[in-house]
Regions:
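Acidic (Asp/Glu-rich) catalytic motifs at the cytosolic membrane interface
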Residues: 30-59, 165-188, 193
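Multi-pass membrane catalytic core of lipid/isoprenoid biosynthesis enzymes
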Residues: 51-96, 185-228, 262-266
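C-terminal ends of transmembrane helices
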Residues: 37-42, 107-120, 168, 172, ...
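Membrane-embedded alpha-helical segments that form the functional core of polytopic membrane enzymes
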Residues: 5-44, 96-110, 150-170
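Intramembrane alpha-helical segments
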Residues: 62-148, 152
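Functional transmembrane core segments of multi-pass inner-membrane proteins
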Residues: 11-18, 128-182, 194-198, 205-208
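Small-residue-rich segments of transmembrane alpha-helices in multi-pass membrane proteins
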Residues: 2-7, 127-142, 188-193, 253-272, ...
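Extended hydrophobic alpha-helices typical of membrane-associated regions
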Residues: 219-340
Length: 340
């Protein structure tokens, strides 16, 4: 919902209009493609997930197939069902450009782990995931709205795309040991821990310097820049964990991967609300239905984040066989299913 809402809000900020039917179609496409990717990754990443000695709450797959709770065949069949739903929704899109973009999005999502491309096994997964989820996703949502594309949409999409690349580096960092055992050559595995930390620090610095530069040039509304800069502490927390060796300790690694993941939806929701406030201050408020949907999405995310943060504070227990037991966790936020 947040990825779709991000693109729709940027389109509304540009054109002032909102189409509920096209939003619902885009949302259905996003959900079906997200489920397809999740089931596909579970199936084709099974060997790597089995080899992972220390999965976190946010990495190493859902463990559903590893623990035998679902058969691999069912996971693959579910991926195909979701794929067919996505194809049907693509056929209903109004223009050739939106249909081609949707097909390209589904193809990249499928071949993220599926052969023959297996992009996440060739150090291309981080960029692919960012391109699909926070690049093509918002662009498709915007193209299906009356407002269409704008320079602001491209700038904001570039910001969250870079954040997603950095997030995926951390996710794959956590899975590095198991990935290397099965020959899964993610970008994080290719770089190694020290260079991942350096790249993460450089990426965060470049990103927020870019936000400041865009705001100074008048390309980014002041409130949007403030909302995006307010999320920088999450990245600093992750970087501190990388430098302090937190990834070597399961509980601390959970915290690092959690905040690496949360920096994205925090930025997305903050940008959405800032754009709506910017419109209101200009005297051209967004359509009421979209304000209700956007604010509702943000409230749901805030509730989920609060609950998840509280759950993460509960102590884990270790069984006699060494198995760590975590507290029950809420359903994943958008993007968690792309765990490598």
């Amino acid at each position: 919902m947040m990825v779709t809402g991000f693109g729709v809000t940027l389109a509304v900020h540009t054109g002032g209009a909102f189409s509920l039917p096209w939003y619902l179609l885009t949302l259905g496409f996003a959900w079906s493609t997200h489920l397809m990717t999740h089931f596909c990754n579970e199936y084709f990443d099974l060997e790597a997930d089995r080899a992972n000695p220390s999965p976190t709450s946010w990495t190493g797959g859902s463990r559903t197939l590893v623990d035998g709770l679902l058969s691999p065949t069912v996971s693959l069949a579910s991926a195909f069902v979701a794929l067919f739903v996505g194809i049907a929704l693509t056929a209903a899109m109004p223009t050739l450009s939106t249909r081609l973009l949707a097909v390209a999005l589904m193809a990249l999502a499928w071949f993220y782990t599926a052969p023959p491309l297996r992009l996440n096994y060739r150090a291309l997964g981080e960029v692919t995931c960012a391109t699909v989820l926070y690049g093509m996703g918002p662009l498709l949502a915007a193209l299906l709205q009356p407002g269409g594309l704008s320079a602001l949409l491209l700038w904001c999409t570039a910001v969250v795309c870079l954040l997603q690349v950095l997030r995926c580096l951390i996710m794959n960092f956590a899975d590095m040991e198991g990935d290397r055992l099965v020959g899964k050559n993610t970008l994080a595995a290719a770089l190694g821990p020290i260079r991942v930390a350096r790249l993460y620090a450089s990426g965060q610095g470049v990103l927020y310097a870019g936000v400041l530069a865009l705001a100074a040039a008048g390309e980014l509304p002041f409130l949007v820049a403030v909302a995006q800069l307010a999320c920088a502490p999450a990245g600093l927390h992750v970087l501190r964990g990388l430098l302090n060796g937190a990834m070597a300790e399961p509980r601390k690694a959970d915290g690092v991967t959690f905040w690496a993941s949360m920096q994205l939806p925090l930025t997305t929701c903050g940008t959405m609300i800032a754009l709506l406030v910017d419109l209101a201050l200009r005297g051209t408020p967004a359509p009421t239905p979209w304000i209700v949907i956007a604010v509702g999405t943000t409230v749901v995310f805030a509730g989920w984040l609060t609950r998840t943060a509280l759950v993460s504070r509960r102590p884990t227990t270790t069984a006699a066989d060494g198995t760590r037991t975590r507290p029950a966790e809420p359903a994943p936020v958008e993007g968690q299913a792309e765990r490598a």
